[in-house]
Amino acid sequence: MPLQDTTLHIRHLGKQDYESVWHAMQHYTDTRNSESPDELWIVEHPPVFTQGQAGKSEHILNAGDIPVIQVDRGGQVTYHGPGQLVVYPLIDIKRSKIGVRQLVTHIEQSIINMLAKYDIQAYAKADAPGVYVNERKIASLGLRIRRGCSFHGLALNVDMDLAPFRRINPCGYAGLEMVQSKALGGPQTVTEAGEQLTITFSQLLGYQHLVHHQGLAAS
């Protein structure tokens, strides 16, 4: 669906701790107005478990030395760590005239389209948000909508240690197996995955102009 504003600002944040980026997302969402641009934040986090608003403590089996942060997104517990691409779409869905479910579908489809370039057959599930390959999960998804705008986003496993996922029931599903793109012949690095996902995401949502930035804007 074409957007009223066809410019998307891409912010390459590199490696950043989770909480500082989370608070920056909240600040951008709370202070943006009808003229504020849509942005896509691309980042890699140190090891952390994040527990969504629907999260149940019993799904954290053994956090060990990895911190657990309670956050304001939808969904259950997930893991972020080095070698995982994390993308936060900060989209004014009210201005863009797309619904929440449609945005979720677009995000999932952008991952599916990106993996298809590498001949990886991925798919979404109606009852379990995210993207899967052969019943193993390759990407997790959790959004929050506030003031008609989205924040939080997606995490794509690229080239990471998947062992910490065994310390939790990922997204609330006991025994859910995870997989990553490098093992499937997909993107080999977080940088490559970010570049390719930016293309499929912007194409799917109708953005025609991409403006790249290094780091966050000065607040």
Curated annotation (Swiss-Prot):
Q: Which GO terms describe its biological process?
A: protein modification process
Q: In which pathway does it act?
A: Protein modification; protein lipoylation via endogenous pathway; protein N(6)-(lipoyl)lysine from octanoyl-[acyl-carrier-protein]: step 1/2
Q: Which UniProt keywords apply?
A: Acyltransferase, Cytoplasm, Transferase
What are the residue positions of the site described as Lowers pKa of active site Cys?
A: K137
The residues that the entry says bind substrate are R73, G74, G75, Q76, V77, T78, Y79, H80, S140, L141, G142, G153, L154, A155
Q: Where in the cell is it found?
A: Cytoplasm
Which reaction(s) does the protein catalyse, per the Swiss-Prot or TrEMBL entry? Answer: octanoyl-[ACP] + L-lysyl-[protein] = N(6)-octanoyl-L-lysyl-[protein] + holo-[ACP] + H(+)
Q: What is its main location?
A: cytoplasm
Instruction: Look up the domain of life of the source.
Output: Bacteria
Q: Where is the BPL/LPL catalytic domain?
A: 34-209
Question: What InterPro entries has UniProt attached to this entry?
Answer: aa-tRNA-synth_II/BPL/LPL, BPL_LPL_catalytic, Octanoyltransferase, Octanoyltransferase_CS
Q: What is its EC number?
A: 2.3.1.181
The extra comment attached to this record reads: In the reaction, the free carboxyl group of octanoic acid is attached via an amide linkage to the epsilon-amino group of a specific lysine residue of lipoyl domains of lipoate-dependent enzymes.
Fetch the HAMAP family from UniProt: LipB
Question: Know the name of this protein?
Answer: Octanoyltransferase
